[in-house]
Amino acid sequence: KEIPGKIVYEDDLCLAFLDLSQTTNGHTLVVPKTHYQNILDVDKEVLSHLIKVTKKLTNQIITNLDAKGANVLTNANEVAGQTVMHFHIHIIPRYNETDQIKIDFTDRSQEVDLDNIFNKINSL
């Protein structure tokens, strides 16, 4: 399948290319060549390889673009913001605290029962 954009990395299992949206300069997607809907479906060997490639590219992007850090993330299912139903990992370089990207982890610790959540997770 033709990828509209600039491919920055490719091997037998995956490719990485600049996201057309460029949330920040250097926003890159790492994508397996085999179709998986999201992280829940990815073969563990493929996922391990994708993480290694993501780490390499994140270091390369931070160094070569003078970024101060990066967000590395994926979305699983529509409720989590997945709009493309093919697994991919976002590498979003961060340059400063005012680059208009906000990932907010609200503290709800007073509202939840951690023991109950823990028990539900571990009952799987």
Model-identified regions with their sequence ranges:
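HIT superfamily nucleotide-processing domains
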Residues: E2-L124
